Design a protein with these regions (language model features):
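A short, conserved alpha-helix in the catalytic core of glycosyltransferases
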Residues: 70-73, 131-152, 157-184
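Conserved donor NDP-sugar-binding/catalytic core segment of glycosyltransferases
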Residues: 62-106
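Short beta-strand segments
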Residues: 21, 59, 86-89, 179-181, ...
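Active-site nucleotide-sugar/metal-binding loop of Leloir-type enzymes
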Residues: 43-54
Length: 214
């Protein structure tokens, strides 16, 4: 397993990161080597066999919009009180497709600001501040390896309810999930809007499992 050692600007210790690039489509230009997988169904065992500090999950078809996006995610992921960290996913119209998950809705989980224009003025400008959320998308997620394994990794969802589920499992052990607006990704709409990137259109089996669990 190849690893990336990222030296956070205000830390003296290098952080070892494994990037898991998943899904179909071209890989974005990344500042790191990656493990390429077709889906996340067997990723739990892969992470168990690494000795990295943190794991970055990245969906093919995403393009970074912020230069220091890895450091931005890492500065929160390395905190002892934090579980999952994610950022905004924007479509080709500059509208939000994801900005952190909320739960307790008919679709299992819904994204904050979904469909809203990036340059709009949402309530309290919540798209522009670092804040706590219930969960973040597995399309762009960083989490410490020990936390990922301690909560059992990803549950077997076909949709991105896996991201909301992982966030809830982190909350259950007292950890926060963080949304930062400074690690944004542009989505290739030919690939990244298709399930299982987001929770829209989740299979009935996923919804049933999610409701029974939470």
């Amino acid at each position: 397993v190849q690893e990336l050692r990222v030296r956070i600007r205000w830390k003296t210790r290098p952080m070892r990161i494994v990037c898991v690039l998943w899904g179909e489509g071209d890989a974005p230009k990344l500042p790191m080597p990656c493990i390429r997988v077709r889906d996340l169904s067997a990723v739990n065992d892969l992470i168990r066999r690494t000795d990295c500090d943190a794991v970055l999950f990245l969906r093919a078809g995403l393009r970074p919009l912020d230069t220091d996006w890895v450091s931005e995610l890492m500065q929160y992921a390395q905190r002892a009180d934090v579980g999952c960290v994610g950022s905004a996913l924007l479509d080709d119209r500059d509208c939000f497709r994801h900005a952190g998950y909320a739960v307790g809705v008919p679709g299992g989980a819904v994204s904050h600001q979904a469909g809203q224009w990036r340059y709009g003025r949402p309530y309290m400008l919540t798209d522009r501040i670092v804040r706590n959320v219930t969960g973040v998308s597995s399309a762009l997620m960083m989490i410490r390896r020990d936390v990922f394994l301690s909560v059992g990794g990803f549950s077997p969802y076909q949709s991105d309810l896996r991201g909301a589920d992982l966030g809830l499992k982190c909350q259950r052990i007292g950890l926060l999930n963080v949304y930062t607006p400074y690690a944004r990704m542009a989505m290739d709409t030919r690939l990244s809007l298709l399930p299982p990137c987001l929770t829209q259109g989740a299979p009935k089996a996923d919804l049933r499992r999610f409701r029974q669990t939470w």
